[in-house]
């Protein structure tokens, strides 16, 4: 399960936290979400992403970036902007975006060499 956790560098770096509640109309959502992760991964400064979604539509995605410039570049990417507009008009009942600077981290992995 450790592969779920992004392999981030030593801080400092930045986290963009996207919390959302999906609407019932999610036609095309899965494909677009996968495309956005793939596209983000190709952007300068992208460090990783972790995402979960509950059956009731609640979800959270945390993406990690090396700078605010990288975040702003991604934020203004044309295809990302189109996906955000579709999210507001069709896919989400509500969402929140928060940006935080990561100043320290602690990682743990159970020893599985027994």
From Swiss-Prot:
Pfam family for this entry, one: ABM
Protein's UniProt name: Uncharacterized protein YqjZ
Native source organism of the sequence: Bacillus subtilis (strain 168)
PROSITE patterns in the record: ABM (PS51725)
Gene symbol of the encoding locus: yqjZ
SUPFAM superfamilies listed in its UniProt record: Dimeric alpha+beta barrel
Domain ABM intervals: 13-99
PANTHER family for this protein: ABM DOMAIN-CONTAINING PROTEIN, BLL5343 PROTEIN
InterPro entries the UniProt entry points to: ABM_dom, Dimeric_a/b-barrel, Jasmonate_Hydroxylase-like
């Amino acid at each position: 399960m450790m592969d779920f956790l992004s392999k981030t560098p030593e801080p400092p770096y930045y986290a963009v936290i996207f919390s959302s509640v999906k609407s019932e109309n999610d036609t095309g959502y899965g494909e677009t979400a996968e495309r956005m992760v793939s596209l983000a991964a190709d952007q300068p400064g992208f460090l990783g992403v972790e995402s979960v979604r509950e059956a009731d539509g609640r979800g959270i995605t945390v993406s990690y970036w090396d700078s605010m410039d990288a975040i702003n570049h991604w934020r203004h990417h044309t295809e990302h902007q189109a996906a955000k507009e579709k999210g507001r008009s069709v896919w989400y009942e509500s969402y929140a975006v928060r940006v935080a600077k990561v100043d320290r981290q602690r990682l743990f992995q159970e020893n599985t060499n027994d």
